[in-house]
Amino acid sequence: MAKTVVRKNESLDDALRRFKRTVSKSGTLQEYRKREFYEKPSVKKKLKSEAARKRKNRRRFK
């Protein structure tokens, strides 16, 4: 879990900005969104193969 301590003489907006940055760097929200709903193993496999195909195409046309 991301933790941010508010520094002395730091505005709440600055602390919130630092907290959001740490959460995005840790990947907490992405992990939550990925696990929010159950995905059948067949769907996971299909999405994984599609992502691999996209990566392969991007590398080929670069």
UniProtKB/Swiss-Prot annotation:
It holds the Pfam family Ribosomal_S21. Residues 53-62 have a biased composition (Basic residues). The keyword rRNA-binding does not apply. Residues 43-52 have a biased composition (Basic and acidic residues). Keywords: Ribonucleoprotein, Ribosomal protein. HAMAP family: Ribosomal_bS21. Belongs to the bacterial ribosomal protein bS21 family. This is Small ribosomal subunit protein bS21. It comes from Lactiplantibacillus plantarum (strain ATCC BAA-793 / NCIMB 8826 / WCFS1).
